[in-house]
Amino acid sequence: ATGSGGMNLVFVGAEMAPXXX
């Protein structure tokens, strides 16, 4: 996942979700 600070956690969740989306 990419991003900085807390935002990285948001992208991590998106990547783990199906169709990410």
From Swiss-Prot:
Gene Ontology cellular component list: amyloplast; chloroplast
Pathway(s) served: Glycan biosynthesis; starch biosynthesis
Signal peptide: none
Main localization of the protein described in the UniProt heading: plastid
Subcellular location: Plastid, Chloroplast; Plastid, Amyloplast
UniProt keyword annotations, A-Z: Amyloplast, Chloroplast, Glycosyltransferase, Plastid, Starch biosynthesis, Transferase
UniProt GO BP: starch biosynthetic process
Transmembrane segments: none
Molecular-function GO terms, alphabetical: alpha-1,4-glucan glucosyltransferase (NDP-glucose donor) activity
Catalyzed chemical reaction(s): an NDP-alpha-D-glucose + [(1->4)-alpha-D-glucosyl](n) = [(1->4)-alpha-D-glucosyl](n+1) + a ribonucleoside 5'-diphosphate + H(+)
UniProt EC number: 2.4.1.242
UniProt record similarity statement: Belongs to the glycosyltransferase 1 family. Bacterial/plant glycogen synthase subfamily.
Protein's recorded name: Granule-bound starch synthase 1
Species for this entry: Aegilops tauschii subsp. strangulata
